[in-house]
Amino acid sequence: MTQTSTLNRPSRRFARLALALALLAVAPIALAEIHIGVILSTTGPAASLGIPEEQAIKLWPGEIAGEKVRFTVLNDGSDTTTATKNAQRLINEDKVDLIIGPSVTPTSLAVVEIAGNAQVPVISLAGGGAIVLPQDGPRKWAFKLSPTEPISIGLVLDHLQKNGKGKSVATIGIATSYGEGFLKAFEAIAAQRGFKIVATEKYNQTDPSVTAQVLKIITANPDAVYIFAAGTPGALPQIELAQRGYKGLVYQTQGVANNDFLRVGGKSLEGGYMTVAPVLVAEQLPESNPVKKAAVDFVQRFEKAQGANSRSLFAATAWDALLIVQNAAREALKKGKPGTPAFRSALRDAIEGLHDFVGSEGVYTMSPSDHNGVDARSQVMVKIENGAWKLQP
């Protein structure tokens, strides 16, 4: 016997109408979900940056500006080709509203090219100025939070001059866009300020030794050595300098400022200097420092989750990216729904309009010509003493 429906035709029409209305009611909720793509280097040479960044992301809430938020986190393995594929997937398949990351300059440059052409905003966690300069083409959709090279370089030269240690400097940097960017900026600024560069050396992130380069530096007998590197590979030149008995000053960029760097370099790092984000020495900051409150708040949140002394300025950069997205989303939601070109464009515009926004690493003021937005307040000088960071006056 054939089973028939017990619903009469009017009842069936009513059921179909009710179902259609229910689906319409659900659709705006699904559409309103903010989807953020994240590309990090959690393996490879830059893993000491990407791992704490990922740990910070786990602290992010599931809601932004009253809307549900979904994160899709991908590992690029510190590889430009993988970062490119990740960006293509996030944009073309996942339809993300914004990308945070990648962790380092070379991968960020690759992602910015793709995302900018697709008109998807990017907040890079890397340091190279080339990510946002010049402000044209795809870079109009790119932002970065770490300070540009001139801010760090200026602080190093001020410190060297203040300590009366002479004016001859040797440099050694990784052969990537990060190292090249710092070298180019340093050459220009050093010349303007009357410093003499007596040696310029380079090495690859995967090189097992820099003995040849360091011997050339020691032969040049500089008053200071400035190392341009990111991640644990930055410890290699400083270890070699210590083993060769170099007695001058050694400076690093904040690209190496993490606990893995301290572990790998050990006692060879003692007495070295570097410019870093204030969050790394949050409790040591004077009360007058405008970022102290936000920096201490982040450190407490992060170390509650990861343990004492686990703080990381790279994690703090990821945290500040969230704070900025939260702020921008409030404005963007007034102009478009998540998942639409209007929302992505409004997000970009809201980030660009940021003014005196205090984060854990600095005070951000963006503009059409400045997609970095930080000033000298984003960097402090620290010295490595007894395996820890010590704020310098």
Role assignments for model-derived ranges:
Residues 2-6, 17, 21, 32-393:
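Extracytosolic ligand-binding ectodomains
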Residues 26-27, 31:
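N-terminal signal peptide c-region/cleavage motif recognized by signal peptidases
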